[in-house]
Amino acid sequence: MQIYETYWEITNEYGYNTERFVETLKICVEYIDEIKLVNPNYTETDYSSVIYNELQMRLQSSPILQSTRKGFEGKPKNETSIRKSINQLVKSGFINPFLTGYHSLAKEYLQTKVNKKRNFLFSRIVYESSNFSYAITDKPDIKVRHINFLVNTLIENFEGKLSKNEIIALMLMDLRTYNGNYYPIDELRNFIRLNQNYISEFKERKYNQITYLWGLLSKLDEIYQKDEFICLEEDKKRVFGDLEDTQYLRKRDPYLHRLYKHQLQEESAEYCGGIKCMLEKLAYPVLIASHIKPFIQSDDNEAYDPNNGLLLSRTLDSLFDLKYISFDDNGNMLKSARLSDDVWQYWRNIKLDSVLLNEKRKQYLKFHRELMEKEDSKN
C-alpha cells in the first residue's frame, strides 16, 4: 500500500438522518429535478457557478437550516457551512457531482416516515455510492466506493472484524489506483507495522475525519461496533462471544487458517464438482470455512483440522455457527427450537452428502448437536 495525502476526506455538516440532513437533501433533489425539467439533456458540461449559487441561496433560505450558533441564532448559514452540507451529500453518495442527478433511492429515503426503513435506505445508498474523494465539481469515478471497499475488507477478513486502527490505515488508500474490491488483512497489518509513526501522526492531524467515519459506520445497518472494533451484526456472537473483554479471545494463525480453508476447498472441488457450498452445491463468490466445534473451544489440532469444518454460504454459516441448525450422522438437517418455522421449511431438505461424513467429522458434529441442545435449553 502506498501512502497518499488524498486520504478519505469525509465531510460532516449535519448528523446523518437528522432533520437538517434530510432537509438539505430534499432541497437538492427538488433543485436537480427543476434543472432536468428545464434541460432534460443536462450534463456536467452545463454546470456553472450560477447553478451552484442558486442552490446555495435556496439552502440559506430554509428556516430549518438557519444557524443555531450562539449569537447567530435564526440567521442564514454562512457559505462555508452550506458548501460543506452539499459536499456531505455528494461524498456519501446521495447526489452526483455537478448536480447531474441523485441516487435512485434518494426520493424513497425522503418519503419514508419509518426510522428503521430510513436507516436501511441510508445504509444501502452509502454502501453502493459513497466516494469520499468527491466534491461537487469532481469528475465521477464509479470504480471508487469507499464504504463498499471497507465492508468487503471486513467480510474477507477470516477473523470477522476490523479494528479502528485498521480502518484508519484503510483511509490512507487511494482507491483510484487499486484494482481489488477489498484489502487483504495480512497486507493491511503489515502496512500498519511498517508505518506506525505516520499513522500516529495522521490520527492526531485528521482526528475529525476519523471521528466522522467512525460515526458513519455506527449508522449503518448490520454493522456492530464494540469498543475499538466493528463486525457484521450477524457475526458478533462468533467474533466477541459472551466475553466482555476482547483480549481473551483466542487468535487465529493466518497461515494455518488459509491452509485449513484451502483443504476444505479441495474437498469441495472433489466431491461437489467445484469450490461450492457443501450443502447448496452453489459456487458463491464468498464461502466461509465454518468450524463445527467452535474455534475458541478447539485445541490447536482441532482448530485447523479440515474434518472440523464445512465450506458454507454466508447464510448457512450463520445458521450453523449460531446453532440454529445441526446435522445427524446421516447428514439430515436438525432444527433448533429457536429457529422460526418459515426458515426451517426453506432449508429442511438440504443435507450433507454421506461422502463428507467421515468418522472424525461425525465426532465434531456430535459436539455441535450438544451445543445446539444447550443453547435451546436456555430459552
Curated annotation (Swiss-Prot):
GO biological process: DNA restriction-modification system
Entry's Gene Ontology molecular function annotations: type II site-specific deoxyribonuclease activity
Record's keyword terms, sorted: Endonuclease, Hydrolase, Nuclease, Restriction system
Reaction(s) this enzyme catalyzes, per UniProt: Endonucleolytic cleavage of DNA to give specific double-stranded fragments with terminal 5'-phosphates
E.C. numbers: 3.1.21.4
Domain of life: Bacteria
Record protein name field: Type II restriction enzyme HphI
Organism listed in the record: Haemophilus parahaemolyticus
Biological classification of the source: Bacteria, Pseudomonadati, Pseudomonadota, Gammaproteobacteria, Pasteurellales
Name of the gene: hphIR
